[in-house]
Amino acid sequence: MKLVTAIIKPFKLDEVREALSGIGVQGITVTEVKGFGRQKGHTELYRGAEYVVDFLPKVKLEAAVDDALVEQVIEAIEGAARTGKIGDGKIFVYDVEQVIRIRTGETGKEAL
């Protein structure tokens, strides 16, 4: 099993969610986060004064999936989240040792 974590632009969340649902991903966790990568933030003008915005709003989504589904999940996220501009985000894939559904006690793939 793998945990696929993606940091994406907030306005792309609905498209990514639909793409993941379309390939059979049954659950995701979404967290609003802030950060920066190569784009390093930007400056904004507010009431005549310039402000530096160091951390940009992003959305982190996490999905625990079976190994057989990982490549499809990556392709779905890439396809739905890509704008072709700096700041589209990143995808990370981690090994998951164990999953337990608290309600039923199911473990492994059955708990996903």
Labelled PLM ranges:
Residues M1-L112:
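Positively charged, small/polar-rich N-terminal and surface patches that mediate targeting and assembly
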